[in-house]
Amino acid sequence: MAISYDLRPVGSCLERKTDNIVVKESSKLSLIGLSQDEIVQALKTVGVPERQTRMRARQLWHWLYVRGVSNFDEMLNISKVMQETLKHHFSIARPEIVGEQISKDGTRKWLLRFPARGAGRPVEIETVYIPEEGRGTLCLSSQVGCTLTCSFCHTGTQMLVRNLTAEEILAQLLVARDCLGDFPDKNTPDGAIVPVEGRKVTNIVMMGMGEPLYNYEAVKKALLIASDGDGLSLSKRRITLSTSGVVPGIIRTGEEIGVMLAISLHAVHDTVRDMLVPINKKYPLTLLMDACRNYPGLSNAKRITFEYVMLKDINDSLDDAKRLIQLLKGIPAKINLIPFNPWPGSNYQCSDWEQIERFADVVNQAGYASPIRTPRGRDILAACGQLKSASERLRKSERLKLENAIGH
């Protein structure tokens, strides 16, 4: 890993974004987030000869996801005439980067703004990059806000505004790779902490704002594009989808997406989990564990990660640790113990470090890997459970006023 703490603003993506990161022209269809078959159909509708559409779609796919271009003029093997046709009808622009924060530990957080859809306002979401020894993990958001109101999570205090589209989910990955110099012929910013060799973004986790399984189709589409071998080509073993326990979506995820699964568990008794993760009232632990045991492809080589935030005097007793072992019996699993990351207005305290270590020892002795996650990006509110944007849902009166103004 290239260790450098020279985090001067000169290295920020905000100062380098004017040429290739622009606000999408909302009147044009974006090619980002479309499947190759959908790109073929889109090309047919704008007069591209049918015999060329499949070849053109492959060219576009390469330029978008291998070369990482955000301007049709950069597509050197496409004629000027075709470039003009594409520019007239389609967009491949990036969202606006409203803000970028860099933690003292090298973690980066971007605040991205997406254009209004329908009668809504433009919305903002947060995306986080976490550099580690030999790898770089990108934490993606799936929704603007969240419906789940988990009591220890900052995002849960922001009501759901809307789901993100497949385009908007993928755009987070493209922006991060732009900013980190992770596409060919792109430079890594001065002072950035990134893996020395290979890709800067090696792993992605659907652990940002929102519940991915409440936006299943868009998340599925985005992850299948991200893992396509002719494009972004991320291994499905390096993609993790985290859910708070939307049981009906768990089996579908394994069958249709095939990525690694993480469960936001956080408690071993229904009474406690009802308080921490209210969706437990709908899908209690018995149903959740049954779904995990039946996750397609589950094996010692493809374990489920169970996330467990350590809350002082709430869920951190040694009896809780022993109950956790019983709960996971028969499930190939790893347990991530997460020291609670405070946020403005939170009502919980992090467990004492000695207690976290004792808890981990009990779980380890039962044969489960139970790493204690090192908090990353706490100083910029980028750590687990700290993400929140300022976007809010329009009140009904405001929405109607806007609809009338634009003639909908």
Curated annotation (Swiss-Prot):
One of its GO terms (biological process) is tRNA methylation. PANTHER family: 23S RRNA METHYLTRANSFERASE, RADICAL SAM CORE DOMAIN-CONTAINING PROTEIN. Its cofactor is [4Fe-4S] cluster. S-adenosyl-L-methionine binds at residues 210-211, 242, 264-266, 341. The keyword Endoplasmic reticulum does not apply. It is an enzyme of class 2 (transferase). Its EC number is 2.1.1.192. The active site is at residues 126, 384. The keyword rRNA-binding does not apply. Disulfide bonds join 139-384. It comes from Bartonella tribocorum (strain CIP 105476 / IBS 506). One of its GO terms (cellular component) is cytoplasm. The gene is rlmN. Belongs to the radical SAM superfamily. RlmN family. Residues 132-373 form the Radical SAM core domain. Reaction proceeds by a ping-pong mechanism involving intermediate methylation of a conserved cysteine residue. It is found in: Cytoplasm. Specifically methylates position 2 of adenine 2503 in 23S rRNA and position 2 of adenine 37 in tRNAs. m2A2503 modification seems to play a crucial role in the proofreading step occurring at the peptidyl transferase center and thus would serve to optimize ribosomal fidelity. Keywords: 4Fe-4S, Cytoplasm, Disulfide bond, Iron, Iron-sulfur, Metal-binding, Methyltransferase, rRNA processing, S-adenosyl-L-methionine, Transferase, tRNA processing. InterPro entries: Aldolase_TIM, Methyltransferase_A, RlmN_N, RNA_MTrfase_RlmN, rRNA_lsu_MTrfase_RlmN/Cfr, rSAM. This is Dual-specificity RNA methyltransferase RlmN.
